Amino acid sequence: QKLQENGLVKIVPYKGTTVTRLNRRIVDELIYERTAVEARVLRDFSPRCTPEQRALIRRRVEAYEALAVMEIPDYNKLYEADRALHGTWFAAMDKMYLWSTLQNAHADYSRFRMLDTMTTGGLAEVIADHRNLMNAIERCDLAAFEPLVERHLYGGIRRLGSKLTEEYADYFEPEK
């Protein structure tokens, strides 16, 4: 019942339970929202970033990298390491309500991220994105944040490309 309340499954009494399809429009809107909010948080955070916070970010980037290069990556640990890294600047700016809202916004976005992570082999690109964000923070390059965050968060759509409408079309609700 809880899965149905969260939109993950559809239960038809006496017939069965099916996993719900992803809503591509919602995924796109959530990425758009997170891009706008996270870029702003980073612009506010970067000038205030302390040496201790920079060291924490570096450790978290390196922790993600260590998980990503394992022979058989643990995708749940990668997901949590990614959340910890991005949560760093939200926590530093005392914007944890925003972070929590973005993380819990809709199950479709989390499921889409897992589809990307588990099927595209795009971990090297994610590592490069994290390094670029870390370097922009260290340089306090305020103009870099929006394009970097946009590239990073839209990466799944870019990596999956035509597979979204071909190989994984059945994972998504039909376009209306």
Where in the sequence are the language-model features?
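Active-site loop of classical SDR/Rossmann-like NAD(P)-dependent oxidoreductases
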Residues: 121-124
